[in-house]
């Protein structure tokens, strides 16, 4: 197995959720909100004792009295003090492990700034005193989880969307495309269109209700114009949703107008290309020899790709953009909300991977820049 006595940990840090657990497991042991909450008022502070902050689901449940911060914005860590609190909570409260005993695989967004990678390495090996660590790009791990090493991954989570072409296990940075539109933006957009219809969703608690409506009732239309016509002429697409207070609301074309923004960001006033176009552009930026393999291995991953109908729509849109002779295959694994974590679990438990770890000793000899030599 490995040179380390204890099982490796796998920690996938997303803008919305932290997924953490043990290498070799099928699913993450802990999944919780990537948030840190602090009291808005001094009186609430006094009730909390010395800690002065809450992390994860506890912060989420007390959101009425707390000011919530997301240390990961659009996939990138922007608040290191809060991120450290989240990691501390992950190891000690969620996984109940001593981090100094476990090598740990962390995930990162594509095109993560060099300084960020070094800072992650430093915190793991110095602050948490880990025996070893490694950092892997999220999209690459999702591809591994699907049983592939070459393909293009469309990863859309809570904070950001990327199209990442990968050849033989290595991401191709010049061809990576990024779209600042993901799950959180879709929730905001659904709130907006429901408010325009006369419903009132304003508070953070009401935002959670809208997120639930999005996750339970929204879907991607194969043909948006046709679907709009159907919704206008009949009630066949309408669904009822019961609010916590017992009131029942009817959701019609909002069901597919909300996720349509992934294909038409202009709905939200963005000038960006849609997910099908960034996927195609990314493929076109790659060498002509590997394009065929990318078209045939198009993997969807992340929570914002869970909408029913999204794979069929991607198939239709990319077929329209690609050369007519090209075989297009869209792969949408049912477990894609956790594909990144699953890929990390597979990778960190491979016997061939054990030489890849950055050991504490190597770190002490070379410093944080070792991350660029060993993780790419």
Swiss-Prot record:
One of its GO terms (molecular function) is ATP binding. GO terms for cellular component: cytoplasm; cytoskeleton. Its EC number is 3.6.4.-. The keyword Plastid does not apply. Keywords: ATP-binding, Cytoplasm, Cytoskeleton, Hydrolase, Nucleotide-binding, Oxidation. It catalyses: ATP + H2O = ADP + phosphate + H(+). Predominantly expressed in testis. Actins are highly conserved proteins that are involved in various types of cell motility and are ubiquitously expressed in all eukaryotic cells. This is Actin, alpha anomalous. It comes from Takifugu rubripes (Japanese pufferfish).
């Amino acid at each position: 197995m490995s040179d380390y006595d204890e099982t490796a940990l796998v920690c996938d840090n997303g803008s919305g959720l932290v997924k953490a657990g043990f290498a070799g497991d099928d699913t993450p042991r802990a999944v919780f909100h990537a948030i840190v909450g602090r009291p808005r008022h001094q009186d609430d502070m006094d009730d909390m004792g010395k800690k002065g902050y809450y992390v994860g689901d506890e912060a989420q449940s007390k959101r009425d009295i707390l000011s919530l911060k997301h240390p990961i914005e659009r996939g990138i860590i922007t608040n290191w003090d809060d991120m450290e609190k989240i990691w501390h909570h992950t190891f000690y409260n969620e996984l109940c492990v001593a981090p100094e005993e476990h090598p740990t695989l962390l995930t990162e967004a594509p095109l993560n700034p060099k300084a960020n990678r070094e800072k992650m390495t430093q915190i793991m090996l110095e602050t948490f005193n880990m025996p070893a660590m490694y950092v892997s790009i999220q999209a690459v791990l999702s591809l591994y989880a699907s049983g592939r090493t070459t393909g293009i991954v469309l990863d859309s989570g809570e904070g950001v969307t990327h199209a990442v072409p990968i050849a033989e296990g290595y991401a191709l940075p010049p061809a990576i495309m990024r779209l600042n539109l993901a799950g959180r933006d879709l929730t905001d957009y659904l709130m907006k269109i429901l408010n325009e219809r006369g419903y009132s969703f304003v508070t953070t608690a009401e935002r959670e209700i809208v997120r639930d409506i999005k996750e339970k009732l929204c879907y991607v239309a194969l043909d948006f114009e046709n679907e709009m016509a159907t919704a206008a002429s009949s009630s066949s697409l309408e669904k009822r949703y019961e609010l916590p207070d017992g009131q029942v609301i009817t959701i019609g074309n909002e069901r597919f107008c909300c996720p349509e923004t992934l294909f038409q960001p202009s709905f939200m006033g963005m000038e960006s290309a849609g997910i099908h176009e960034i996927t195609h552009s990314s493929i076109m930026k790659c060498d002509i020899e590997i394009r065929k393999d990318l078209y045939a291995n198009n993997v969807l991953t992340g929570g914002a790709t869970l909408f029913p109908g999204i794979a069929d729509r991607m198939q239709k849109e990319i077929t329209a953009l690609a050369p007519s002779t090209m075989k297009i295959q869209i792969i949408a694994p049912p477990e894609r909300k956790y594909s990144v974590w699953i890929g990390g679990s597979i990778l960190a438990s491979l016997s061939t991977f054990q030489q890849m770890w950055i050991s504490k000793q190597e770190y002490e000899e070379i410093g944080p820049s070792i991350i660029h030599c060993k993780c790419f």
